[in-house]
Design a protein with these regions (language model features):
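Solvent-exposed, non-transmembrane regions of membrane-associated and secreted proteins
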Residues: 20-192
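N-terminal Lys/Arg-rich, disordered targeting/topogenic segments
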Residues: 1-8
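Hydrophobic H-region at the start of alpha-helical membrane spans
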Residues: 10-21
Length: 192
């Protein structure tokens, strides 16, 4: 009877140890992945701010927009030319001061693609910020629909939770959203 109890105790210790190692491994990989994603977006932000090399391909960019009759888009802003060379589906950049939100905005005909892919078109559980397939940056509008995950780590749109605080809203009333063709500043009207 005593030997059976000793065996059960040892088995329980081994099982608990295996579970603990598995949990530590999972959280280690999870944290590493979040750090890697943050570093990737920091590099993209630096690439955005870097001057484009002269003589880079200046061909017109074809975007996936609601109206495909637009044949000659306006010139691309210099700060987005380097990123556009990485992925022609780049449509803009969204930034909110004092948050982690400082990301490229993608657009494609498939609204689900960028739920789990990044600008480099690699699998990324954080996905990307992306514009609805039916929005057209070439048509004047005061409304664009942007999608992104609300990550618990604060990445992507995770820091939007701060807007539930009235004083935070008053201190941060604007969102900067630039298309690759023009800069834009949008006032936040409602939070829900």
């Amino acid at each position: 009877e005593l030997k059976k109890q000793e065996k059960r105790r040892k088995l329980l210790v081994v099982c608990c140890s295996v579970i603990a190692v598995a949990c530590l491994g999972y959280f280690g990989i999870y944290n590493w992945y979040n750090i890697r994603t943050a570093d990737n977006y920091k590099q993209l932000s630096e690439l955005k701010d870097k001057e484009p090399a002269t003589g880079q391909n200046q061909d017109p960019v074809i975007h996936y927009t609601a109206d495909e009759t637009q044949s000659t888009p306006p010139p691309v802003l210099d700060e987005y030319k380097n990123l556009l060379n990485k992925n022609k589906r780049l449509i803009g950049w969204v930034k909110i001061d004092d948050t982690n939100i400082d990301y490229p905005v993608m657009q494609t005909t498939d609204n689900e693609y960028y739920l789990d892919h990044n600008l480099n078109q690699e699998y990324d559980k954080n996905g990307s910020i992306f514009m609805d397939k039916d929005c057209d940056v070439l048509k004047p509008s005061t409304n664009f629909i942007l999608y992104g995950h609300h990550m618990k780590s604060g990445q992507m749109f995770g820091s939007l939770s701060s807007y539930s605080d009235q004083s935070y809203c008053e201190k941060h009333p604007y969102i900067q959203f630039d298309t690759i063709y023009e800069k834009g500043l949008y006032e936040i009207m409602y939070v829900f």
